[in-house]
Amino acid sequence: MGQKIHPTGFRLGITQDHWSRWFADTDRYPELLQEDFKVRNYVNKNLSNAGIAGVRIERKADQIDLEVRTARPGVVVGRGGSGIESLRVGLQKELGDDRPIRINVVEVARVDAEATLIAEYIVQQLVRRVSFRRVVRQAIQRAQRAGVEGIKIQVGGRLNGAEIARSEWTREGRVPLHTLRANIDYSYRTASTTYGILGVKVWVFKGEVIPGADEQPTNREPQQRRRQQQRRRQQFEDRSE
């Protein structure tokens, strides 16, 4: 089951939290849900060069609180806060009212350990027609330098322009999808290339969350685990040259 279900939805309330935190009456729920969809689309579209890792939405009465997690907070804030003000005005026009919107910008501590940013990086390289094997290898190396416990990347579609679509994946370290206490960061993105659509999936294992304690990486039986990783490891060969 852990291999098929969405890793984030599988762990809601355990290691993952909801990206939208508000309550509403039954009649207003669809309207507010569509507003959340519009807000996230607007932020991701207009701040595509800021490395947006996620947008958390909270509602208090008629006020909307946004928490924008980004790799480049200076791009979002702008000079003298002009970026935030223009973003607020644009969101009010998108929603069609003048409700107060409070925006809090949070910098991502480890950029190369965020599944969303890793997937965005791979998509950008695939659109530039870089070999997918080379891109995946570079992304894994950057994630390992960032200190992740494990990472798995899958790319599917007409890889390198092949006539028959296929999917290939590689994994480094542990990615325990069946373990509920495992903090798994997951993201899915699509790349529009001249040969068609390529799907990119990224799983990042950041350690196990022990109840009543901070997030801790598991270091039990390192030698045995290393031997298992060597047996299960699958390397991409770069045949683009």
Curated annotation (Swiss-Prot):
GO terms for molecular function: mRNA binding; rRNA binding; structural constituent of ribosome. The keyword Ribonucleoprotein applies. It comes from the Bacteria. GO terms for biological process: translation. InterPro entries: KH_dom, KH_dom-like_a/b, KH_dom_type_2, KH_sf_prok-type, Ribosomal_S3_C_sf, Ribosomal_uS3_bac-typ, Ribosomal_uS3_C, Ribosomal_uS3_CS. PROSITE patterns: KH_TYPE_2, RIBOSOMAL_S3. SUPFAM superfamilies: Prokaryotic type KH domain (KH-domain type II), Ribosomal protein S3 C-terminal domain. Pfam families: KH_2, Ribosomal_S3_C. Residues 39-109 form the KH type-2 domain. The keyword Transcription regulation does not apply. Residues 213-241 are annotated as: Disordered. GO terms for cellular component: cytosolic small ribosomal subunit. Keywords: Ribonucleoprotein, Ribosomal protein, RNA-binding, rRNA-binding. Belongs to the universal ribosomal protein uS3 family. Part of the 30S ribosomal subunit. Forms a tight complex with proteins S10 and S14. HAMAP family: Ribosomal_uS3_B. NCBIfam families: rpsC_bact. Binds the lower part of the 30S subunit head. Binds mRNA in the 70S ribosome, positioning it for translation. This is Small ribosomal subunit protein uS3. It comes from Acaryochloris marina (strain MBIC 11017). The gene is rpsC.
